[in-house]
Amino acid sequence: YVMGHFRWDKF
């Protein structure tokens, strides 16, 4: 996780 899982990290 980087920020949380809004866009890129959600994959």
From Swiss-Prot:
Highest taxon of source: Eukaryota
Disulfide cross-links: none
Gene Ontology molecular functions: hormone activity
Cell compartment(s), UniProt: Secreted
Protein's UniProt keywords contain Transit peptide: no
Keywords recorded for this protein, A-Z: Amidation, Hormone, Secreted
Positions carrying Phenylalanine amide: F11
GO CC terms in record: extracellular region
Transmembrane parts of this sequence: none
Family: Belongs to the POMC family.
Protein name per the record: Melanotropin gamma
Organism: Theromyzon tessulatum
Organism ancestry: Eukaryota, Metazoa, Spiralia, Lophotrochozoa, Annelida
